[in-house]
Each structure stands twice: as structure tokens, then as C-alpha cells.
Amino acid sequence: MIKLIYFDFNFWRIDILRLCLSYSKIPYEYVRINRQQWPKKKKEFPFGQLPVMIVNDKQYSQTHSLAKFCATRASLYDTNELKILIIDQVLDWANEITTHIAPSIRAAMREKNLAKSKKLRQEFIENDLHLWFSYLENLLKNSSLNKKFFTDKFSIADIAAWRVIFWFCSGKLDLIDPSFLNQTPILKNYYN
């Protein structure tokens, strides 16, 4: 049995793994770690990060690697090398845009510095938000004939793209107006 471990909140990094496995009805156990417990538990995990997956009593980590594993098990990864490149680009895009917004989140959550968080978030909106979503839209436009799925059939790429777009359009990220997606009409249509 597969065991997935993450914090006690939903986030795309764990959700894409759970959605892959659930989509194909692959059983798994889900363990949530409370944020207050994390400093004590951190050293128990590879790279000191979550998510972690345990298979056959061995720990594995890094979101992209775990996503490939779960997607392969769930038949949501491809065997065609060029389709794999498209899927991996979407997974890497998700990680990159998260890396760009992360400083504004850390300023609020860890440092409790709301003024710094607001400044960093505004910089992200001005410099990165539209840019990174236009990158994703261009990938969809150039890789998909039907504009419904990145590889023209449902895959982990679609799960990851949908989940990250959902996060940015959820209203949970301060200062980010969900209407930003109007600037990328192909992507907006894909998401809706």
C-alpha cells in the first residue's frame, strides 16, 4: 500500500498525488502532520520536506518524482517521449510559479510580516503572475489540438494545471484577483 504524508492542509503538491491515485481507484493511506509537530519530525524525512510517499517501507520525496510515480501507476502518464516532455513541463511550471509566489507566503506565515508579504505579493503580481500563466497558456496552445487536455488525453499534466489554477483563482491568495485569468482566454476556457 502507498502511504502519502503531508501537512494538515490542502495544497497542490499533495493533492495531485491523491487525485491521481483516487482517479484510478488505487488505495492509499494519507497521513497529515500538524504544523506544530513539523520541526520535530522534519529530520525523519528525505530532504526535510513534504510530501513524502512510503512504498514497501521505503520513503521517497520530491513532488515531481512522486507525481510521475503516481501518474504511472494510475495510467495518467504517457509512454510517448514527446508527450512526457509536455507533462513534465506542466509539472515543472507548477513548481516554478510556486517558487515565485513563495516569498510572499513565507513573509506572512513564518515571519508574520504582513507589510513585507504585501510588497512581495504586489511584485509577484506585477512581474510574474501574467507571465507564468501566459507560459502555461502557450504550452497548451502549442501542444494540444483539442485544447481540452495538454496531451490531447487526460493526464497528470491536467490535474496539476487545474489544481494550481484553482489555487490562484480561489481568492485565498491575498491581492490576487481571480479575473487575472481573463488575460489568458485559452487557459480560462481550459480551466472552466
What kind of feature is each model-predicted range?
Residues 83, 121, 132, 183-190:
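Alpha-helical structural motif
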Residues 139:
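Extended, charge-enriched "interface" segments that sit outside catalytic cores
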Residues 125-136, 164, 190:
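Alpha-helical packing segments of well-folded alpha/beta enzyme cores
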Residues 1-123, 127-130, 142-144, 153:
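GST-like domain detector, emphasizing the conserved glutathione-binding G-site
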Residues 87, 149-188:
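GST superfamily/GST-like fold recognition
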